[in-house]
Amino acid sequence: MRVFHYARDRWIERITNDGFLKLTGVEAVPGVQPSLLPGLVWLTKLEQVPHTCSYPPEGMIQYVFDSDNPKIQHWPLVKKKIMAGVTGYVLNKYKVSKKWNVHPDRLAPASAMAEGLDKYAVEAGDDPDDFYVSLKRLSPTDCLEMNETPERIQAQARGEMVQVEDKITREIYITYRPIVAGGDVES
């Protein structure tokens, strides 16, 4: 399971279970010169790929970018796109210093989830706009890699909402039913 993160003002500190990476401030990815970092870097357990385009290579996580600033996508912009119907992605919310997850019993359509995440953040004493967002598409293969149950894999294949726990990183991913005509949004 590849794991990708980014932050607006600094790298999110991230230590995988195998202790593979830990990035804070403006530290460079191992083996990558700082001058090559565009302000956004795609991180995986297996490799580090600096990336300057709006969309990553095939098979990597795809973020929803703001056309005026393809390097960064902060929560208010992501929420705006979700409310506009850009769904079918996995939504994670991160803070530099902490992480919290939506309770699995609170699954809802994407627009309601976008509003709900703000509500939960406020209830936890956090400013929703302090959170950073990663968006990932899930496939039945991803579910298999995460030791998901056949029932959830089948639900994912039907396009239904599924709450998935990554057994490797212990993160919660929330997937939504795609509602955009024509399938995936690429622009």
Sequence positions of predicted segments:
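ADP-ribosyltransferase catalytic core
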Residues: 24-108
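Ordered hydrophobic segments in well-structured contexts
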Residues: 1-7, 40-43, 60-64, 76, ...
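Short, flexible beta-strand-to-coil junctions
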Residues: 6-13, 46, 64-70, 125
